[in-house]
Amino acid sequence: MVFDCDGVLVDSEVISVRVDQLVLADLGWELELDEIVERFVGRSEAHFVATVEEQLGLELGEDWDRKYESWYRTAFERELVAVEGIVEALDELRLPHCVASSGTHAKMRRTLGQTGLWHRFEGRIFSATEVANGKPAPDLFLHAAGTLGTAPERCAVVEDSAHGVQAARSAGMHVFAYAGGVTPAERLEGPGTTVFSDMRQLPALIGTGRPSLP
């Protein structure tokens, strides 16, 4: 099982989207929350920066990066918790599992550590910074599977974003799409995808160890 991190393991997407909105407004780009979800949730920080620079016709320097990181860090330290039900789901899981996230290793070390989940995945954590193309390209999921010596068709992915779901499908992996976050269920539905809304449902959906892969 390959788990996304933000919005699947740690309940960070609501926080991130809100901070994104504040940061973008500070730069002069006003976006509604649902627009931010569609454009950026599931994508890498590099994609976010490139999109903002192209949209606003400017180069975001180190000062901006430090300010942005400070806003994120403050919000996460105050509000970040594990996704409801994920601890119970992981306790029942009988499959080898890893994390493959658009976030950086430093970010995952912080968020998984803060929520008490780091030890469950240590040594099996993959970041989009390790591959040429982030989600919705399949590179990250294929990299994780290849590193762990598992064929893509024998893998399943737990995702919460439309971009992540697309990446998993493109990798030839079955997707368990969590609709309990910021992305509406209808944007997650599609072939090879099981949509669910409560993490406590996950073990039963995969048969507590035997996902029904296509």
Roles of regions detected by a PLM:
Residues 74-99, 105-109:
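Short, acidic loop-to-helix structural element flanking the phosphoryl-transfer center
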Residues 50-88:
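Metal-dependent phosphoesterase signature
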Residues 26-30, 56-59, 116-120, 149-150:
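Short helix-capping segments at alpha-helix termini
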Residues 17, 21, 37, 45-50, ...:
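An amphipathic alpha-helix signature
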Residues 1-38:
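Active-site neighborhood of HAD-like aspartate-dependent phosphohydrolases
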Residues 40, 44, 67, 81-85, ...:
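Short beta->alpha linker loops
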Residues 23-24, 44-58, 111, 145:
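Helix-loop "lid/cap" segments that line or gate small-molecule binding pockets
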Residues 95, 104-214:
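Asp-based, Mg2+/Mn2+-dependent phosphohydrolase catalytic module
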